Regions:
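Charge-rich, low-complexity N-terminal segments
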Residues: 1-77
């Protein structure tokens, strides 16, 4: 099943830009997932199972590296 996901990451830290950029750079490393960046969010397009696994890994890593953040995720399936 194909899905579209719209993600907005709001790190709760003074230095928030590195956390956002690193998250985007990591999700761009998944060859089967299309990634579109814009000013307010990042959009992912691809297989539901692959995107859910990607999110599980990358959200955890982001929180471990940069601490608390607000993450808004919208799914279109």
């Amino acid at each position: 099943m194909e899905v579209s996901v719209d993600i907005s990451l709001y790190p709760l830290a003074d230095e928030f830009i590195p956390a956002i950029n690193e998250f985007i750079e990591r999700v761009q490393q998944y060859p089967s997932i299309a990634v579109v960046r814009n000013d307010f969010s990042t959009q992912l397009f691809g297989d539901y199972e692959q995107i859910m696994e990607l999110l599980k890994i990358e959200i955890k890593l982001s929180w471990e590296q940069y601490g608390k953040s607000i993450l808004v995720v919208k799914f279109l399936g």
